[in-house]
């Protein structure tokens, strides 16, 4: 229902993204990077785009990355909302235990979102996971190529809009502009305001 709102751009600088560092009873660390969605004990996440599903409290959206030392344990808290869907992607490390289940290879795991889960890095190397969760939007979906709307009529209108204006016009003189070869970290916002950050900024800066 928010597909026709004004576009919005936010740069989430790595060093500004909040993190929770948890040391278990043995002193082994789990670091949770909070890209979106509140995590108990962590600083508040950065603001999502104002009309996104992540900005709606009922969306219960979370995007967290986990890095666990060998042997580390951390309890993933239950999601807030009933009906929230939750996926845990294990993609770096040797082995992971989720509750009573041992996972000996990289995998995508759908977890029951309404309960806590004890996670244990049972491998000999650091482990990394990505957690994605949210409430289903529960609206009709129509899709064609890169266009996603709610009805076929909206798909046709979006295609016509793109053919006519390329969604507002293409302001560059060619189809493949580049930003140059120098190493820079910058963001350019609507109105041409530009923000630049150090290439080696410390986390928390």
Features from the language model and the residues they span:
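Jelly-roll (double-stranded beta-helix
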Residues: 1-205
């Amino acid at each position: 229902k928010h597909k026709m709102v004004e576009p919005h751009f936010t740069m989430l600088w790595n060093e500004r993204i909040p993190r929770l560092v948890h040391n278990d009873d043995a002193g082994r660390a789990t670091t949770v990077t909070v890209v979106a969605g509140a995590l108990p004990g962590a600083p508040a996440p950065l603001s999502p785009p104002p009309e996104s599903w992540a900005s709606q409290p009922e969306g219960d959206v979370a995007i967290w990355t986990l890095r666990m030392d060998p042997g580390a344990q951390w309890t993933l808290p239950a999601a807030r909302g009933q009906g929230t869907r939750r996926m845990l992607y294990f993609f770096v490390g040797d082995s992971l235990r989720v509750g009573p289940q041992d996972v000996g290879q990289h995998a995508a795991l759908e977890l029951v979102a309404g309960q806590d889960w004890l996670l244990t890095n049972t491998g000999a190397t650091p482990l990394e996971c990505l957690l994605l969760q949210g409430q289903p939007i529960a609206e009709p979906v129509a899709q064609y190529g890169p266009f996603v709307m709610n009805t076929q009529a909206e798909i046709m209108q979006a295609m016509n809009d793109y053919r006519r204006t390329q969604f507002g016009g293409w302001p560059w003189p060619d189809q493949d502009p580049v930003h140059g070869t120098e190493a820079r970290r910058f963001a350019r916002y609507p109105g041409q305001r530009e923000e630049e950050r150090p290439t080696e900024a410390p986390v928390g800066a």
